[in-house]
Amino acid sequence: MVYTISGIRFPVLPSLHKSTLRCDRRASSHSFFLKNNSSSFSRTSLYAKFSRDSETKSSTIAESDKVLIPEDQDNSVSLADQLENPDITSEDAQNLEDLTMKDGNKYNIDESTSSYREVGDEKGSVTSSSLVDVNTDTQAKKTSVHSDKKVKVDKPKIIPPPGTGQKIYEIDPLLQAHRQHLDFRYGQYKRIREEIDKYEGGLDAFSRGYEKFGFTRSATGITYREWAPGAKSAALVGDFNNWNPNADVMTKDAFGVWEIFLPNNADGSPPIPHGSRVKIHMDTPSGIKDSIPAWIKFSVQAPGEIPYNGIYYDPPEEEKYVFKHPQPKRPQSIRIYESHIGMSSPEPKINTYANFRDDVLPRIKKLGYNAVQIMAIQEHSYYASFGYHVTNFFAPSSRFGTPEDLKSLIDRAHELGLLVLMDIVHSHSSNNTLDGLNMFDGTDGHYFHPGSRGYHWMWDSRLFNYGSWEVLRYLLSNARWWLDEYKFDGFRFDGVTSMMYTHHGLQVSFTGNYSEYFGLATDVEAVVYMMLVNDLIHGLFPEAVSIGEDVSGMPTFCLPTQDGGIGFNYRLHMAVADKWIELLKKQDEDWRMGDIVHTLTNRRWLEKCVVYAESHDQALVGDKTLAFWLMDKDMYDFMALDRPSTPLIDRGIALHKMIRLITMGLGGEGYLNFMGNEFGHPEWIDFPRGEQHLPNGKIVPGNNNSYDKCRRRFDLGDADYLRYHGMQEFDRAMQHLEERYGFMTSEHQYISRKNEGDRVIIFERDNLVFVFNFHWTNSYSDYKVGCLKPGKYKIVLDSDDTLFGGFNRLNHTAEYFTSEGWYDDRPRSFLVYAPSRTAVVYALADGVESEPIELSDGVESEPIELSVGVESEPIELSVEEAESEPIERSVEEVESETTQQSVEVESETTQQSVEVESETTQ
């Protein structure tokens, strides 16, 4: 690969003299050149295993694991050495004594209230982040000065310093073969942490860039700052000055930061009224342009206009939302309801934050989920991008309401005990130039990699340069902003695989060979960024959750950064959904139980997974949901209970329940469901879109901007006269089963049977025994089930219950007594009836009392009772249904009579003689 870098820019440092470097500052990177030449320079990457040459446009690739250094350079100069080298700084340093701010006041830093020092930083330093209204041209090395007024800054929260990074080798000895790469990666991470501590006052201060950049309000006026080193001139324009580019001209400092201070009006009112449209007018190498400020907090699209407009958002105190409820603690097992605000209405329209708060959140709580993951929060000008082509990273989407509406939604979720996770996009950015970050200052390599490396050819988007100091500030501050300002409880990071590899995971098959993860294709800069953002999240917000969307299976992904890992709490177990689609394209006879079990349990030791049978990806136009794969067009005509069912419907409903339960039961430590899929939402998602004319002349047909398939028909799941209702109630029972037993996070997991002949899978998780019979016709009487603990077992969940659209072939009052003797590598066993296409969960009943699971927090609903005791009843779900006639079923598909089980007699009857495999999974 060939990378060219046009120049270099140092981070903003209040303790530095002005730089006299004679080079272009349009590109920014952590990878600094080592020798300063007046005419040209080359620099060596300190992150990746290749060397970059900005003149020859060539790269030297190391055949070994060594980092190549050109002959005329060495790698002995650190970032700190370069920043402190007097040879590359100006001699005309100014200090901060008697410093007069642009608001006319004098300030000093009160060291008693502001130390900006983290663990491991013995000196500490005052940073630009603390000098909110300081002209960055007047910077000095002093940490305290004397003047007329004091600036009180809150003491920073403590983020633990880096550790040794060596524990990963104890956890996974296979990593030893790649120690050089991993130690190099950890060394880069430690170096950046140290430099952030030294020059920016620590990760806490560094991640509060929104207090310095963009619009900041003080008692005397408004300061606006923007990093745009490529711009030749800049001015702030908007409604407040009639869009006059000559009215409020900005000044540029030595580091490419443009600034202007607007004093209050004579009557004390702010110079820019709340709600005013604003943009930055720049003369750039690409021409004159008006851009939305990169740090804008709100943007809207005016009627009849295509580009968005930035909005100065600073409502009066009485209009600002005040959070009333504490954020919930992180649950042991996280059960996520993936959602999208705009398409959350049953009606064909764009829904609002307020409607979602009032209508959808109570539904999520009633279903038994404990977290809601919200997509498309960051502003995106193209609605059909599903929120993944972000244009304004700090602005919540105005399609759905105001920032205060979003805060109200999150506060209501917290009142209900729900975590709120944000689907955050830091993997790429919209390529829009008018209302996005692309070509912001007129240069190709501003926030992004220059040249082809900065473009994602499949997504048609721009790729961030994670080696840039200001990009790190921007993205880390962005994550901090959503947690701090809006009280989100964590993130699902989108497109992490694309970030971690220069090939972006495209046209690459990951086989599990470790060289695929720790080679030349690994983007170490991006991996280090993820380590930093996880440090930030877990250090400042210990209860927050970070989930990464990685399809590659990167080792160390969910191990702590102090141990050498990347630091996520969970990875998405993405292979499971693909496996189900693969199987649904086959005949039932071709399903292999061992294949299913292997896919579900193929997880890395000590690295937690959030598993799902399907997410929004499977619901998009061009794909199918599980329900549609299973039942197809029959869903249009045979889902009403007053109509006879069909074999396709019977099969589909049965397998839909089994697939979801075995996915939750065996696939991970967390579970995710996309809204509506709990009841088998029919059809696909298709956002409103018009006809598109591509540059190559091709035309992509639209859907006449229809919202018909961009909504969620929750009414289908609620209608007790439709078969969707039974599927929804089963999903609800699954969530409450996990809530009661916590089996997903239990350390005890044992797979005792995966029988290809019987099509039976049996496993233990916690004190539960799961029995799945995937056979399409065969039901088994007196089927022996191995177990660990002795005693009496009872049914606590039965997919064949009529409440869930089943045939009621099991006796829920039956008791199952264990008998001694090894079977399937278990010391005991009990006998059950295993009907075809059913999943049944048994719990040890002895000595355990049953208590109803109350749905509280303002959700009116009857409790769900899980039978965990001797005298308890099986699961009872509250439903709002009328009495319905018995459902006639196909004889070929089911057996209509219930076989009564003799559970006290130890007899082995009709089991087929097949090879039994047993397996322990950790």
Swiss-Prot record:
The wrinkled seeds phenotype (rr) studied by Mendel in 1866 is probably caused by an 800 bp insertion in the SBEI gene, leading to the loss of the last 61 amino acids of the protein and a complete absence of activity. Pathway: Glycan biosynthesis; starch biosynthesis. Residues 897-922 have a biased composition (Low complexity). Pfam families: Alpha-amylase, Alpha-amylase_C, CBM_48. Residues 1-47 form a transit peptide. Expressed in roots, leaves, stipules, pods and flowers. InterPro entries: A-amylase/branching_C, Glyco_hydro_13_cat_dom, Glyco_hydro_13_N, Glyco_hydro_b, Glycoside_hydrolase_SF, Ig-like_fold, Ig_E-set. Its EC number is 2.4.1.18. GO terms for molecular function: 1,4-alpha-glucan branching enzyme activity; cation binding; hydrolase activity, hydrolyzing O-glycosyl compounds. SUPFAM superfamilies: (Trans)glycosidases, E set domains, Glycosyl hydrolase domain. Residues 83-130, 870-922 are annotated as: Disordered. The keyword Chaperone does not apply. Monomer. Catalyzes the formation of the alpha-1,6-glucosidic linkages in starch by scission of a 1,4-alpha-linked oligosaccharide from growing alpha-1,4-glucan chains and the subsequent attachment of the oligosaccharide to the alpha-1,6 position. May preferentially transfer short chains during branching. Responsible for the synthesis of about 75% of the amylopectin found in the starch granules of mature embryos. It catalyses: Transfers a segment of a (1->4)-alpha-D-glucan chain to a primary hydroxy group in a similar glucan chain. Residues 99-109 have a biased composition (Basic and acidic residues). PANTHER family: 1,4-ALPHA-GLUCAN-BRANCHING ENZYME. The gene is SBEI. It is found in: Plastid, Chloroplast; Plastid, Amyloplast. The active site is at D494, E549. Keywords: Amyloplast, Chloroplast, Plastid, Transferase, Transit peptide. This is 1,4-alpha-glucan-branching enzyme 1, chloroplastic/amyloplastic. GO terms for cellular component: amyloplast; chloroplast. One of its GO terms (biological process) is starch biosynthetic process. The keyword Plastid applies.
